[in-house]
């Protein structure tokens, strides 16, 4: 059976033992917070990652409007924040590896190229800012194309039932950005993705608890 966490439900199905197959996917959401500032100096505040069940908040570094003067593209590292999905309590006798699929959520959307687009109707939101997600470990560094098949990074589940999936998120310009006629404006940046963790098993169904 497929397990349900908050935001997604899956059709139940029966699997027979004895061959490699996919285990119940775990699901959750990640909300990315950021800020584009008109200030001329940087003011720092301790940054933390908050967890509520399988729903997480990640705060990117504050950046400035001037940082968007030239095109950044999908290789941007502006304000980059690295984060990890930690898997634990996996049955390592049956769960062999894990991967995560990311889709837009909570009013966010995506571009055809897979960039994450914040909702446009939020009061005080920065304009012409998108977010770019990428793999950052387990031999994978490719762009995560939101709302497309993107669970390309595989984490091996170790003997103690743990595994890690490594990612990074950064600012980039929105698809309507133009340095002269449609520049980035100051304001908050908030976008959300839903993730589903898939686990490959060898004999029987098993689940993992994810968190960071």
Regions from the language model: what does each represent?
Residues 1-22:
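Gram-negative bacterial Sec-dependent N-terminal signal peptides
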Residues 2-3, 21-212:
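Mature extracellular/passenger domains of Gram-negative fimbrial/pilin and adhesin proteins
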């Amino acid at each position: 059976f497929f397990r349900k966490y908050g935001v997604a439900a899956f059709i139940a199905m029966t699997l027979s033992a004895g061959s490699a197959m996919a285990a119940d996917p775990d699901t959750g959401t990640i909300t990315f917070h950021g800020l584009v500032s008109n200030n001329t100096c940087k003011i720092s505040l301790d940054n933390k990652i908050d967890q509520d069940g399988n729903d997480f908040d990640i705060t990117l570094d504050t950046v400035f409007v001037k940082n968007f003067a030239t095109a950044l593209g999908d290789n941007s590292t502006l304000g980059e924040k690295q984060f990890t999905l930690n898997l634990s309590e996996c049955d390592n006798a049956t769960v062999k590896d894990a991967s995560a699929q990311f889709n837009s959520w909570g009013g966010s959307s995506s571009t055809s190229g897979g960039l994450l687009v914040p909702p446009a109707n939020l009061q005080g939101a920065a304009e012409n800012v998108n977010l770019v997600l990428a793999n950052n470990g387990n031999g994978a560094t490719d762009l995560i194309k939101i709302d497309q098949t993107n669970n390309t990074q595989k984490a091996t589940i170790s003997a103690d039932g743990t595994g890690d999936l490594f990612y990074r998120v950064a600012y980039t310009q929105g698809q309507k950005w133009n340095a002269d006629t449609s520049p980035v404006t100051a304001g908050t940046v908030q976008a959300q993705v839903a993730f589903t963790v898939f686990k490959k098993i060898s004999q029987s169904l098993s689940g993992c608890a994810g968190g960071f």
